[in-house]
């Protein structure tokens, strides 16, 4: 009997045939992947959680033991219990481990932590990552054998504790949500003599971060130091550091010695605008930071940082000169960043490359600065007006194509030696796209435009 869905000359596949066809295509895809060498399959599996990688053993006999020799193990489900992890380690066969990641919140796992770390060390692990929740972290101490390991190159620690650690071969250290003291940090640094990169993420308690004895440390990143004793700015002594990235939440840091710095990325986040910290204090502190960047050639400034610099410019506070050759501005386009940007550009005579990134960066509403300037007696209709006569949008939500064009022209007018500009913005600014060739021709520079679709 003919299929009811058929017509003369055309036969529409039945649902049964469609399912069979779909299964066949999946099988062909699996077979195609299965033909790859083990080393490639294991490299692919190293990018997914180990629990998921183990499920590939059900695909076929070909896959049964592939996961056992992957270069990395990742136990990223904090609910995983000890029997599962123990069984996984028993079946693991790789002699060399690149990365071991453990995320757990189960208090019952605490007695097993030392043996799991010891297992990773026995496989000469390069990168050890521990993310332990409070109730687990409070009962955990680094075992003695950890201190004499010679293979560990990178350590990521997410713990609510302060402790000392010694890892003589460690090159990268990432500490998150740790309560530190100057003494404990000094002990950690003493135990890591060849450390090259240090990241402090949401750590608190430090008054002075002294890196003067870390002769190989080249990269320092501090993200939201959440607590500073007595609201004093943390001092940074880093004479050997080449790259500095700061994003502070309570107070900007005080740069005591960064004499070797070549690259810097600076911003302050929302808490820096709390009522307990005045804008005039912030402007003084931020300008002191900029004065320490006299040798920096690659500089990135965030939108909140630029807003405070705008206040300083409107008040007539002198800015330092810069040797910057590559400048990136991570900001939305609105009136509260204009004066600060103009002054930074004018004080950067050697600038060759300028990058504008406008992609959804979080900014404190500029109205705060407007209210602050109003209290100081400024004419708000004039103080935020560009010297070129442009009146800017007050809200970062009201950016039109003409604002983008005016913004780019303003930056071009305030530079003298610029060779290249890179602009990243949302793709609906059609008029600006049309203006790029003219701007490039008029100012004799190369403009690279990259667009993206805004998130819905």
UniProtKB/Swiss-Prot annotation:
SMART domains, per database record: FBOX
The LRR repeat ranges on this chain: 177-202, 203-213, 228-253, 278-303, 333-358, 396-422
Domain F-box residues, every copy: 30-78
Keyword annotations from UniProtKB, A to Z: Leucine-rich repeat, Repeat
CDD domains registered for this protein in UniProt: F-box_AtFBL13-like
Keyword Repeat: yes
Gene3D superfamilies, A to Z: 1.20.1280.50, Ribonuclease Inhibitor (3.80.10.10)
Highest taxon of the lineage: Eukaryota
Pfam families on file: F-box, LRR_At1g61320_AtMIF1
Repeat in keyword set: yes
PANTHER family per the UniProt record, alphabetical: OJ000223_09.16 PROTEIN (PTHR32153)
Protein name in the entry: Putative F-box/LRR-repeat protein At3g18150
Annotated source species: Arabidopsis thaliana (Mouse-ear cress)
